[in-house]
Amino acid sequence: MHVMNCVSLVSDKENGNIATAPGFMIGQTPPPAPPPPPPPPPPSPPCSCSREECPSSPPPPPPPPLPGEPPIPPPPPGLPPTTHMNGYSHLGKKKRMRSFFWKTIPEEQVRGKTNIWTLAARQEHHYQIDTKTIEELFGQQEDTTKSSLPRRGRTLNSSFREAREEITILDAKRSMNIGIFLKQFKKSPRSIVEDIHQGKSEHYGSETLREFLKFLPESEEVKKLKAFSGDVSKLSLADSFLYGLIQVPNYSLRIEAMVLKKEFLPSCSSLYTDITVLRTAIKELMSCEELHSILHLVLQAGNIMNAGGYAGNAVGFKLSSLLKLADTKANKPGMNLLHFVAQEAQKKDTILLNFSEKLHHVQKTARLSLENTEAELHLLFVRTKSLKENIQRDGELCQQMEDFLQFAIEKLRELECWKQELQDEAYTLIDFFCEDKKTMKLDECFQIFRDFCTKFNKAVKDNHDREAQELRQLQRLKEQEQKQRSWATGELGAFGRSSSENDVELLTKKGAEGLLPFLHPRPISPSSPSYRPPNTRRSRLSLGPSADRELLTFLESSTGSPEEPNKFHSLPRSSPRQARPTIACLEPAEVRHQDSSFAHKPQASGGQEEAPNPPSAQAHQLAAAQPENHASAFPRARRQGVSVLRKRYSEPVSLGSAQSPPLSPLALGIKEHELVTGLAQFNLQGSQGMEETSQLTLSDFSPMELESVGHRGPQSLSASSSSLTPMGRDALGSLSPALEDGKAAPDEPGSAALGSVGSSDPENKDPRPLFCISDTTDCSLTLDCSEGTDSRPRGGDPEEGGEGDGSMSSGVGEMGDSQVSSNPTSSPPGEAPAPVSVDSEPSCKGGLPRDKPTKRKDVVAPKRGSLKEASPGASKPGSARRSQGAVAKSVRTLTASENESMRKVMPITKSSRGAGWRRPELSSRGPSQNPPSSTDTVWSRQNSVRRASTGAEEQRLPRGSSGSSSTRPGRDVPLQPRGSFKKPSAKPLRNLPRQKPEENKTCRAHSEGPESPKEEPKTPSVPSVPHELPRVPSFARNTVASSSRSMRTDLPPVAKAPGITRTVSQRQLRVKGDPEDAAPKDSSTLRRASSARAPKKRPESAEGPSANTEAPLKARGAGERASLRRKDSSRTTLGRILNPLRK
């Protein structure tokens, strides 16, 4: 095949066409690197190749062309050429080219046809490639390499041949290892041997020199090398080195001397360092006083722990015992005896804790060992001594090493001395710690102290961590205690705060200053008794609160400057739910401050921080203060023309027996000016008349009554202000009808309406004497029952706020709901209580938020009007009268057994609440105050709870005791839940027994006693609704209160309003306990809620609850009890009347 190819290639060459074609194709295909790659003319490349090769090898020109084409073969068109190209072209002399991997066209497709390749063949002469250039660029260097390789090969071959000529004496493997070792020195074997001979170790390390010792020839090898008599130059590298080494005398000793000389200084330096460290560590242990103190502490602790035992009373202990301290666990988790020792050391001196810092070298001894140091030193001695002895045989070597040996010996002696000193000190240390020299080693001693230092430091750190943790825990506990205290203070003092004697005393001492804490509303906690469930709260945006606010604004504008409420001691509250202000009847600043403080206290009890003060106590104090200031207070009120409805929950004190002793200066009796409409002229009897007047709290007055008081205020106030003593029962009797008309009777027991001193209502301008009833319980006290109830839920309502009430004629906002409208004492029977009082009353009775009470107040005014209107028709006596004229509120004087000091606002009439929500039932309650609304009942529970906490006396007759247990404690009692008072629709309210109804009785006795007896005669209710409606401001006319007022005429007939007022009345009913009961019945949509619930209960026990309430009151006086019962019945009637309104 190859021959054929060669022939074909030769023929192609001869043809020339092919040769030219390949040349052309090469020109045509510059990309192909190989010069003869043209596929169709593969022979042509051979031609060129052959041309080139012909001179070199003319006989085999064909084969060379093939080899010339192998670079082209990838593209050769014909297989034969390809194989031929793959032939021996490379083996030929021609330079090999890099292959160009292309795809060739079969030759048969190209030849004999007209195509680009045949054309190119024709024009090949025009395009010729520079073969030399392409060879230079793409020729492989293999040729050169091969040429050089053969030369190198020849050289190597010659060297190998020479090596082969070398003589190898040593083992091949050993010879190789030695050769590798020697190459690192980059010196000839002879120079290395010369350095060894001369003892020059500078250029060699100790390790290198030691390697020389390893490669020293063995005896057999020495014999062979010595036996070698041939050409030394022919020996291998290793053999040559060993051969030259054995020629050096004592070569082995010389190398050893070189190694010792090289290693001696480092070894000596290391020994010096180690010995120094050990000796220093020994000194540290013996001189560290802190360590010694720690050891003594350990000894003391051990003796204490082991006292009485065989190990007790020890004088010392083994050092190894130090490590056992951590193993003795303490009773305290995570603590052991070592921790205790560390604590004791800290107590003694904190410096003791840092003793380990003075044992710095002891820590370094961890890597050292006295034995190792001694062994190393001994080795140096041996080596030096051996060398010294051995070199004696070789004078030349001895001279070389003489200086070194002298230096080494000197150093070794010095080290030996150091070592000896170290040993002595070690023994001294062991003796110092009373250890056995034979058993205790220095290394062990150091190890014990190292471990002890480590453990002690860890114990110190643990103690610090523990102390820090304990401090953090204590801090957390303190914070928790503070939080708990703050909550407790909030719950006990701020939440559900009711008037208490303590607060009264505090305010007595501090005066106006003491009011500041009470003016700040406190958060209501669900756990606090004053907490009002959200479902019973009314949003400030609700219609009731907005109406109340409008009414408040209206009253303020009508009465005069908004500051007038302050004049009447209606203190502004910081929050919308502020405690209701006390009546302004108390002129003197002290009295006013007391009143305001009292009012705020009850207000606080309603929803603020103030500690619950027994309403009775406050009432007594207020009453006492009022008699002193009533005269001036009333005139001022009149002059101011401000219709300030004081706490509608405060009982009309004037209704109490006129003979009750004056209250203590702090007993802030709410002087309520009632415009008794349709009532006989008041018997203003000296102090009695004033007291009764004071007993008739402003809550007894309907807003219109207050307004009329404002108009009549100067006269009636002058008359009433003549004395704060409660009016004679006759006068009270005369008042009672008006109260019945205005629903005063219901209001009196539960809450004395704060009569607006200045009459904002022109209709009420009737010049009738206002009863400035100094309620034995402060207006705030009165609020305790009714307001307290409301205030608890409403704690921040502005209506309850002193100013809010004042501006609304605070009684209107709070007491006005029930008492103001119910007590139209000063207003003509025909006149309806001002809508203001009505609004205030609903706010109180409604149990809605104070904002809502404001709305209620607006609504209540109409209600009161309607109640009053109904009350004129209804006879006060009996529940029937109550139902008809439950609105009317009879003024009751204190019975002989009663006194103002005993007076407290006790919602007695609420007992009938369980009867059902019916204002008509209020008429049945006639003597009793307004039936507690469902809210009142709820609040009554809360208030009764607070009353219970405040004082038993504050607790009114237990509702459970009363037939319907609807009787409510005065403002103090409101917290007591009235179980019997339940609206059918409203959730049943538990009856809370009023532990001290007597105090409340006194309040009620004052308000109710006269009321019930005289309410009956005063049954003629003053249909003031028409008047009230005209009076109702435009904003109040559209309110529920206005509609309820309009409906109030129908109130007596409509006895069922349970569904309407349940939520609102539940709390407010409680709040309105005594004065509120009347008030809700009288007027207030809010009251309506309470009265609604109260009527329900009152029908069941309208008289019964009142009787139950009266029972405690009977303790104060049979008259009071009777009056309370009458009030309860009247309240029932009012509740019945109000129920329709609520609907």
UniProtKB/Swiss-Prot annotation:
GO MF, one annotated term: microtubule binding
Residue ranges occupied by any FH2 domain in the UniProt entry: 87-482
Gene3D superfamilies xref list: Formin, FH2 domain (1.20.58.2220)
Entry-annotated residues carrying Phosphoserine: 500, 650, 660, 664
Disulfide bridge partners, by residue number: none
GO biological process, one term: cilium assembly
Subunit comment: Interacts with CEP170.
Record's protein name: FH2 domain-containing protein 1
Organism per entry: Homo sapiens
Encoding gene (name): FHDC1
